[in-house]
C-alpha cells in the first residue's frame, strides 16, 4: 500500500512550481474571479471553452490546458464543483478524485490545488474550510489506490506512472493549522480504507481466518486496541455451532476475533460492529456455480471493513467506545462439510 504524499504550502498558485496546477471552479456561464487573469495569460483559452460549452464548472467537468510557459506549472487543470450554493465536502471529494485520476493518467508526478476558493465558500460557516480541505486530500488519496502486490515486474517495462505528491496551496498563514489538521485526518481515513481494500484484494489462499487473526493482533499492538482471538476449542465450549459448522469442511481453523477500543469511560455503552469473515465461500456441499466463484474471496469484506474501522477509530482517538467482532472461517466442500438439514449445537 503506497499512499500519495500530501502537504501544504503558503504560496501563490501561479508562482508555484508543479507539473499540474488544479483549480476547483464553481459552475458559471462565463469566466469570473481569478480565472479572468489566468484566461488572459492563456489568450482566452478558458473563455473559449466556456463559449463552446466544453467547460462550465459543472460537477465532474474537467478542462486540461497547456500553459505554454505563462506560469510555473506547465499544465492547468480546471475541475468543476457545481453550483456555489450546492458545494459540499462530498462534491469536493468527488471532484478531487476526478482531477487526481486525470492528472495521473496524464503522467504527472506532482500536482497542486488552490484552496483559496474555499475561503469564500466557507465564509460564515464554522469548520467548513477544514472539511473542504480534507475532502480534497481524501478524494485524491482514495482515487489513486493501486493493488500491485502480485504483478510481475519486467526490467524492460517502464514502471507505471503515478501521481506522487499533491500540495494544497493556501493564501493565508491563518489557514495553516486547520489545513494541516485536515490533511492528517484525511491521511488516516485513506490508510484505513486502503487497509480494507488490501484485505479484500488479496486471494483466498493468502487471506485465511488465521491471516485475519494475525492482522488483528498486529493492528492491536500498534494502536490503542485490545485483541482477543478465540480458537476452535474455545468456540466449542461456548456452543458456537453455526460458525464451527461452516468451518468444519475446511482444513483452515476458524477464528472469532474481538477488538475493543475505549476512548470514553468504560461504563459507557459501546458501539458494536460485527463483520462477516468467510475468507472463501464455495457454498460447501451446496456448491456455488463455477463462473465467478473466484469472487467468493470477497465474502470477508465485512471483516475487512470492521478491522479497518477499528484502525480508524483508534488512529483518530475518538472519544467513544467501539467493539469490533469478526467471525472468520473458510467454507469448503469435503467429507466433513456441513450438510443441509444438519442440527448445529
Give residue ranges: language-model regions.
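Conserved protein kinase catalytic core
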Residues: 86, 287, 333
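Catalytic-core environment of secreted peptidases
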Residues: 258-298, 336
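A structural-propensity feature for long, helix-poor, extended segments
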Residues: 326-328, 333-345
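Alpha-helical metal-binding/catalytic segments enriched in His/Glu/Asp
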Residues: 216, 271, 287-330
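Short amphipathic alpha-helical segment within the helicase RecA-like ATPase core
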Residues: 2-277
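Short flexible/disordered coil segments
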Residues: 120-122, 191, 195-197, 232, ...
Amino acid at each position: 500500500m503506497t499512499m500519495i504524499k500530501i502537504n501544504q504550502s503558503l504560496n501563490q498558485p501561479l508562482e508555484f512550481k508543479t507539473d499540474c496546477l488544479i483549480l476547483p471552479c464553481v459552475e458559471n456561464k462565463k469566466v469570473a474571479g481569478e480565472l479572468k487573469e489566468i484566461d488572459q495569460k492563456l489568450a482566452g483559452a478558458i473563455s473559449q471553452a466556456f463559449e463552446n460549452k466544453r467547460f462550465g464548472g459543472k460537477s465532474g467537468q474537467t478542462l486540461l490546458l497547456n500553459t505554454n510557459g505563462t506560469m510555473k506549472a506547465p499544465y492547468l487543470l480546471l475541475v468543476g464543483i457545481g453550483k456555489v450554493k450546492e458545494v459540499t465536502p462530498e462534491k469536493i471529494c468527488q471532484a478531487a478524485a476526478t482531477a487526481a485520476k486525470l492528472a495521473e493518467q496524464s503522467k504527472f508526478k506532482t500536482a497542486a490545488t488552490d484552496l483559496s476558493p474555499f475561503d469564500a465558500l466557507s465564509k460564515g460557516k464554522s469548520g467548513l474550510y477544514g472539511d473542504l480541505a480534507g475532502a480534497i486530500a481524501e478524494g485524491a488519496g482514495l482515487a489513486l489506490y493501486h493493488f500491485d502486490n502480485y504483478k510481475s515486474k519486467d526490467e524492460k517495462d517502464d514502471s507505471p506512472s503515478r501521481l506522487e505528491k499533491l500540495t494544497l496551496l493556501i493564501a493565508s498563514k491563518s489557514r495553516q493549522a486547520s489545513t494541516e489538521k485536515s490533511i492528517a485526518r484525511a491521511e488516516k481515513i485513506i490508510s484505513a480504507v486502503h487497509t480494507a481494500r488490501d484485505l479484500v484484494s488479496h486471494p483466498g489462499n493468502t487471506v485465511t481466518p488465521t491471516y485475519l487473526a494475525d492482522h488483528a493482533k498486529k493492528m492491536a499492538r500498534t494502536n490503542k486496541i485490545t485483541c482477543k482471538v478465540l480458537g476452535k476449542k474455545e468456540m466449542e465450549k461456548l456452543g458456537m455451532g453455526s460458525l464451527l459448522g461452516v468451518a468444519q469442511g475446511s482444513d483452515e481453523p476458524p477464528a472469532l476475533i474481538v477488538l475493543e477500543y475505549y476512548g470514553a469511560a468504560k461504563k459507557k455503552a459501546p458501539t458494536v460492529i460485527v463483520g462477516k469473515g468467510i475468507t472463501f465461500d464455495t457454498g460447501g456441499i451446496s456448491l456455488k456455480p463455477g463462473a465467478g466463484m473466484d469472487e467468493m474471496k470477497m465474502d470477508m469484506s465485512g471483516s475487512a471493513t470492521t478491522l479497518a474501522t477499528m484502525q480508524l477509530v483508534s488512529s483518530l482517538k475518538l472519544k467513544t467506545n467501539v467493539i469490533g467482532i469478526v467471525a472468520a472461517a473458510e467454507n469448503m466442500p469435503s467429507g466433513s462439510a456441513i450438510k443441509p438439514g444438519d442440527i448445529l449445537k
